[in-house]
Protein backbone atom coordinates (compact mmCIF):
# COMPACT_ATOMS: atom_id res chain seq x y z
CA UNK A 1 0.00 0.00 0.00
CA UNK A 2 2.80 2.41 0.95
CA UNK A 3 4.70 1.60 -2.25
CA UNK A 4 1.60 2.44 -4.25
CA UNK A 5 1.96 6.06 -3.12
CA UNK A 6 5.33 6.34 -4.90
CA UNK A 7 4.37 4.57 -8.06
CA UNK A 8 4.04 6.69 -11.16
CA UNK A 9 0.45 7.02 -12.18
CA UNK A 10 -0.42 5.77 -15.62
CA UNK A 11 -2.43 8.12 -17.73
CA UNK A 12 -4.11 7.54 -21.01
CA UNK A 13 -4.10 10.60 -23.19
CA UNK A 14 -7.37 10.88 -24.98
CA UNK A 15 -7.21 12.98 -28.11
CA UNK A 16 -10.43 14.94 -28.61
CA UNK A 17 -12.10 14.38 -31.88
CA UNK A 18 -11.69 17.53 -33.87
CA UNK A 19 -12.98 18.18 -37.30
CA UNK A 20 -11.04 20.81 -39.17
CA UNK A 21 -13.61 22.88 -40.92
CA UNK A 22 -12.48 24.24 -44.21
CA UNK A 23 -13.50 27.81 -44.84
CA UNK A 24 -14.97 28.08 -48.34
CA UNK A 25 -12.90 30.13 -50.73
CA UNK A 26 -14.03 33.72 -51.07
CA UNK A 27 -15.66 34.06 -47.64
CA UNK A 28 -12.93 36.37 -46.31
CA UNK A 29 -11.01 39.08 -48.13
CA UNK A 30 -7.81 40.83 -47.06
CA UNK A 31 -7.69 44.60 -47.52
CA UNK A 32 -4.87 45.57 -49.87
CA UNK A 33 -4.14 48.76 -47.92
CA UNK A 34 -4.52 48.07 -44.18
CA UNK A 35 -4.38 44.25 -44.17
CA UNK A 36 -7.69 43.88 -42.32
CA UNK A 37 -9.45 40.55 -42.86
CA UNK A 38 -12.97 41.37 -44.05
CA UNK A 39 -16.09 39.25 -44.28
CA UNK A 40 -16.90 39.33 -47.98
CA UNK A 41 -20.67 39.70 -47.51
CA UNK A 42 -20.12 42.75 -45.31
CA UNK A 43 -17.62 44.14 -47.82
CA UNK A 44 -20.11 43.72 -50.65
CA UNK A 45 -22.83 45.46 -48.62
CA UNK A 46 -20.45 48.39 -48.18
CA UNK A 47 -19.94 48.80 -51.95
CA UNK A 48 -16.60 46.96 -51.76
CA UNK A 49 -15.11 49.68 -49.57
CA UNK A 50 -12.97 48.54 -46.61
CA UNK A 51 -14.90 49.07 -43.37
CA UNK A 52 -11.67 49.89 -41.50
CA UNK A 53 -9.59 52.17 -43.75
CA UNK A 54 -11.96 53.13 -46.59
CA UNK A 55 -9.90 51.47 -49.33
CA UNK A 56 -11.91 51.14 -52.54
CA UNK A 57 -11.56 47.68 -54.07
CA UNK A 58 -11.75 47.50 -57.85
CA UNK A 59 -15.13 46.63 -59.34
CA UNK A 60 -16.19 44.66 -62.36
CA UNK A 61 -18.31 46.47 -64.94
CA UNK A 62 -21.34 44.44 -63.84
CA UNK A 63 -20.84 45.40 -60.18
CA UNK A 64 -20.41 49.06 -61.09
CA UNK A 65 -23.63 49.11 -63.10
CA UNK A 66 -25.57 47.32 -60.34
CA UNK A 67 -24.38 49.89 -57.78
CA UNK A 68 -24.98 52.93 -59.97
CA UNK A 69 -28.08 52.65 -62.14
CA UNK A 70 -31.70 51.92 -61.28
CA UNK A 71 -32.47 48.21 -61.18
CA UNK A 72 -33.54 46.85 -64.56
CA UNK A 73 -32.94 50.13 -66.38
CA UNK A 74 -29.65 49.30 -68.13
CA UNK A 75 -30.00 48.48 -71.83
CA UNK A 76 -26.68 47.57 -73.39
CA UNK A 77 -25.55 49.22 -76.63
CA UNK A 78 -23.34 47.67 -79.33
CA UNK A 79 -22.93 44.34 -77.54
CA UNK A 80 -22.03 42.58 -80.80
CA UNK A 81 -18.88 44.61 -81.48
CA UNK A 82 -15.84 42.34 -81.16
CA UNK A 83 -12.12 43.11 -81.49
CA UNK A 84 -10.03 41.65 -84.29
CA UNK A 85 -6.32 40.98 -84.68
CA UNK A 86 -5.28 43.68 -87.19
CA UNK A 87 -1.58 42.80 -87.22
CA UNK A 88 -1.98 39.01 -86.89
CA UNK A 89 0.01 38.85 -83.67
CA UNK A 90 0.36 35.21 -82.56
CA UNK A 91 -0.77 35.59 -78.92
CA UNK A 92 -3.37 38.35 -79.19
CA UNK A 93 -6.36 36.20 -80.09
CA UNK A 94 -5.68 33.74 -77.27
CA UNK A 95 -5.44 36.64 -74.80
CA UNK A 96 -8.80 37.94 -76.00
CA UNK A 97 -10.38 34.51 -75.58
CA UNK A 98 -8.93 34.17 -72.08
CA UNK A 99 -10.17 37.64 -71.11
CA UNK A 100 -13.68 36.88 -72.38
CA UNK A 101 -13.83 33.63 -70.45
CA UNK A 102 -12.58 35.13 -67.18
CA UNK A 103 -14.73 38.29 -67.25
CA UNK A 104 -17.89 37.38 -69.15
CA UNK A 105 -17.34 40.46 -71.32
CA UNK A 106 -16.73 40.76 -75.06
CA UNK A 107 -14.47 43.78 -74.55
CA UNK A 108 -13.07 46.00 -71.82
CA UNK A 109 -16.05 48.37 -71.81
CA UNK A 110 -19.82 48.14 -71.34
CA UNK A 111 -22.01 50.88 -72.77
CA UNK A 112 -25.73 51.37 -72.45
CA UNK A 113 -28.72 53.56 -71.74
CA UNK A 114 -29.90 53.65 -68.14
CA UNK A 115 -31.60 55.69 -65.45
CA UNK A 116 -30.06 56.99 -62.21
CA UNK A 117 -32.73 57.81 -59.62
CA UNK A 118 -35.08 58.16 -62.57
CA UNK A 119 -32.84 60.51 -64.58
CA UNK A 120 -31.97 59.17 -68.06
CA UNK A 121 -28.32 58.93 -69.11
CA UNK A 122 -25.93 57.03 -71.34
CA UNK A 123 -23.50 55.13 -69.12
CA UNK A 124 -20.06 53.77 -70.04
CA UNK A 125 -18.13 51.49 -67.67
CA UNK A 126 -14.60 50.20 -68.25
CA UNK A 127 -13.47 46.94 -66.65
CA UNK A 128 -9.79 46.59 -65.72
CA UNK A 129 -10.09 42.79 -65.54
CA UNK A 130 -10.21 42.68 -69.35
CA UNK A 131 -6.59 43.21 -70.42
CA UNK A 132 -6.32 46.10 -67.93
CA UNK A 133 -9.11 47.85 -69.87
CA UNK A 134 -6.59 48.86 -72.51
CA UNK A 135 -8.13 50.98 -75.26
CA UNK A 136 -8.22 49.32 -78.66
CA UNK A 137 -10.37 49.93 -81.70
CA UNK A 138 -13.55 48.40 -80.25
CA UNK A 139 -13.22 50.22 -76.93
CA UNK A 140 -12.77 53.49 -78.81
CA UNK A 141 -15.66 52.73 -81.15
CA UNK A 142 -18.06 51.83 -78.34
CA UNK A 143 -17.22 54.99 -76.41
CA UNK A 144 -17.62 57.06 -79.59
CA UNK A 145 -20.99 55.48 -80.32
CA UNK A 146 -22.09 56.06 -76.73
CA UNK A 147 -21.26 59.76 -77.07
CA UNK A 148 -23.17 59.88 -80.36
CA UNK A 149 -26.16 58.12 -78.76
CA UNK A 150 -26.13 60.66 -75.93
CA UNK A 151 -26.07 63.53 -78.42
CA UNK A 152 -28.84 62.04 -80.58
CA UNK A 153 -31.06 61.25 -77.59
CA UNK A 154 -30.20 64.50 -75.80
CA UNK A 155 -29.06 62.60 -72.72
CA UNK A 156 -26.10 63.21 -70.40
CA UNK A 157 -23.08 60.94 -70.78
CA UNK A 158 -21.35 59.35 -67.78
CA UNK A 159 -18.07 57.47 -68.27
CA UNK A 160 -16.43 55.42 -65.50
CA UNK A 161 -12.80 55.19 -66.61
CA UNK A 162 -10.33 52.51 -65.56
CA UNK A 163 -7.46 51.67 -67.86
CA UNK A 164 -3.80 50.86 -68.24
CA UNK A 165 -3.66 52.87 -71.48
CA UNK A 166 -3.61 52.07 -75.18
CA UNK A 167 -3.70 48.45 -76.33
CA UNK A 168 -0.24 47.78 -77.69
CA UNK A 169 -1.39 44.77 -79.72
CA UNK A 170 -3.34 47.14 -81.98
CA UNK A 171 -0.50 49.59 -82.50
CA UNK A 172 -1.27 52.93 -84.14
CA UNK A 173 -4.95 51.97 -84.45
CA UNK A 174 -5.27 52.06 -80.68
CA UNK A 175 -3.65 55.50 -80.47
CA UNK A 176 -6.12 56.82 -83.05
CA UNK A 177 -8.92 56.12 -80.57
CA UNK A 178 -7.70 59.00 -78.43
CA UNK A 179 -8.49 61.56 -81.14
CA UNK A 180 -11.64 59.71 -82.17
CA UNK A 181 -13.21 59.74 -78.70
CA UNK A 182 -12.21 63.37 -78.11
CA UNK A 183 -13.89 64.40 -81.38
CA UNK A 184 -17.09 62.58 -80.38
CA UNK A 185 -17.12 64.39 -77.04
CA UNK A 186 -16.63 67.72 -78.78
CA UNK A 187 -19.75 67.04 -80.86
CA UNK A 188 -21.62 66.10 -77.67
CA UNK A 189 -20.59 69.42 -76.14
CA UNK A 190 -21.86 71.28 -79.20
CA UNK A 191 -25.27 69.73 -78.52
CA UNK A 192 -25.18 71.19 -75.03
CA UNK A 193 -25.20 67.83 -73.29
CA UNK A 194 -23.51 67.15 -69.97
CA UNK A 195 -20.51 64.83 -69.79
CA UNK A 196 -19.51 63.54 -66.35
CA UNK A 197 -16.17 61.73 -66.15
CA UNK A 198 -15.63 59.43 -63.16
CA UNK A 199 -12.01 58.40 -62.65
CA UNK A 200 -11.50 55.09 -60.87
CA UNK A 201 -8.40 53.09 -59.98
CA UNK A 202 -6.39 53.01 -62.20
CA UNK A 203 -6.95 55.62 -64.94
CA UNK A 204 -3.67 55.93 -66.81
CA UNK A 205 -2.05 56.17 -70.23
CA UNK A 206 -3.96 57.21 -73.33
CA UNK A 207 -7.30 57.09 -71.54
CA UNK A 208 -6.20 59.65 -68.94
CA UNK A 209 -4.79 61.80 -71.76
CA UNK A 210 -8.00 61.79 -73.81
CA UNK A 211 -11.67 61.37 -72.93
CA UNK A 212 -11.21 60.73 -69.19
CA UNK A 213 -9.83 64.24 -68.61
CA UNK A 214 -12.48 66.10 -70.62
CA UNK A 215 -15.56 65.89 -68.44
CA UNK A 216 -17.63 68.99 -67.79
CA UNK A 217 -17.44 67.64 -64.25
CA UNK A 218 -14.55 65.35 -63.28
CA UNK A 219 -15.17 63.08 -60.29
CA UNK A 220 -12.66 60.66 -58.77
CA UNK A 221 -12.99 57.82 -56.30
CA UNK A 222 -10.84 58.17 -53.16
CA UNK A 223 -7.27 56.97 -53.61
CA UNK A 224 -7.59 56.32 -57.35
CA UNK A 225 -4.32 56.25 -59.32
CA UNK A 226 -4.63 58.82 -62.10
CA UNK A 227 -1.90 59.84 -64.54
CA UNK A 228 -0.22 59.22 -67.86
CA UNK A 229 2.89 57.27 -66.89
CA UNK A 230 3.27 55.41 -63.61
CA UNK A 231 5.14 56.99 -60.67
CA UNK A 232 8.04 54.57 -60.94
CA UNK A 233 8.58 55.37 -64.63
CA UNK A 234 8.53 59.10 -63.90
CA UNK A 235 11.01 58.76 -61.03
CA UNK A 236 13.39 56.76 -63.21
CA UNK A 237 13.12 59.36 -65.98
CA UNK A 238 13.57 62.56 -63.96
CA UNK A 239 15.74 60.90 -61.28
CA UNK A 240 13.84 62.59 -58.50
CA UNK A 241 11.61 61.37 -55.70
CA UNK A 242 7.97 62.24 -56.30
CA UNK A 243 5.80 63.87 -53.61
CA UNK A 244 3.80 61.59 -51.31
CA UNK A 245 0.52 60.57 -52.93
CA UNK A 246 1.58 61.88 -56.33
CA UNK A 247 -0.98 60.87 -59.00
CA UNK A 248 -3.59 59.93 -56.41
CA UNK A 249 -7.06 61.45 -56.58
CA UNK A 250 -6.53 63.67 -53.53
CA UNK A 251 -3.30 65.16 -54.94
CA UNK A 252 -4.96 65.88 -58.28
CA UNK A 253 -7.91 67.58 -56.62
CA UNK A 254 -5.56 69.85 -54.68
CA UNK A 255 -3.97 70.88 -57.98
CA UNK A 256 -7.19 71.46 -59.91
CA UNK A 257 -7.33 68.39 -62.14
CA UNK A 258 -10.32 66.86 -60.34
CA UNK A 259 -13.51 68.68 -59.31
CA UNK A 260 -14.86 66.26 -56.71
CA UNK A 261 -13.79 63.19 -54.77
CA UNK A 262 -16.83 61.06 -54.07
CA UNK A 263 -16.77 57.87 -51.96
CA UNK A 264 -18.50 55.00 -53.69
CA UNK A 265 -21.48 54.75 -51.31
CA UNK A 266 -22.39 58.35 -52.22
CA UNK A 267 -21.71 58.05 -55.96
CA UNK A 268 -25.24 57.29 -57.16
CA UNK A 269 -26.75 60.08 -55.06
CA UNK A 270 -24.12 62.56 -56.29
CA UNK A 271 -24.66 61.66 -59.94
CA UNK A 272 -28.43 61.97 -59.54
CA UNK A 273 -28.03 65.42 -58.01
CA UNK A 274 -25.81 66.57 -60.89
CA UNK A 275 -28.24 65.18 -63.47
CA UNK A 276 -31.08 66.99 -61.73
CA UNK A 277 -29.20 70.30 -61.87
CA UNK A 278 -28.42 69.78 -65.55
CA UNK A 279 -32.01 68.96 -66.49
CA UNK A 280 -33.28 71.97 -64.56
CA UNK A 281 -30.87 74.16 -66.51
CA UNK A 282 -32.21 72.84 -69.81
CA UNK A 283 -35.79 73.88 -69.01
Curated annotation (Swiss-Prot):
Enzyme Commission code(s) on record: 2.1.3.15
Keyword check for Cytoplasm: yes
Annotated InterPro entries: AcCoA_carboxyl_beta, Acetyl_CoA_COase_Trfase_b_su, ClpP/crotonase-like_dom_sf, COA_CT_N, Znf-ACC
Catalyzed reaction equations: N(6)-carboxybiotinyl-L-lysyl-[protein] + acetyl-CoA = N(6)-biotinyl-L-lysyl-[protein] + malonyl-CoA
Residue span, CoA carboxyltransferase N-terminal domain: 27-283
Cellular location(s): Cytoplasm
Listed PROSITE patterns: COA_CT_NTER
Pathway: Lipid metabolism; malonyl-CoA biosynthesis; malonyl-CoA from acetyl-CoA: step 1/1
GO CC terms of this entry: acetyl-CoA carboxylase complex
Subunit annotation: Acetyl-CoA carboxylase is a heterohexamer composed of biotin carboxyl carrier protein (AccB), biotin carboxylase (AccC) and two subunits each of ACCase subunit alpha (AccA) and ACCase subunit beta (AccD).
Function, in words: Component of the acetyl coenzyme A carboxylase (ACC) complex. Biotin carboxylase (BC) catalyzes the carboxylation of biotin on its carrier protein (BCCP) and then the CO(2) group is transferred by the transcarboxylase to acetyl-CoA to form malonyl-CoA.
Protein name: Acetyl-coenzyme A carboxylase carboxyl transferase subunit beta
Gene encoding the protein: accD
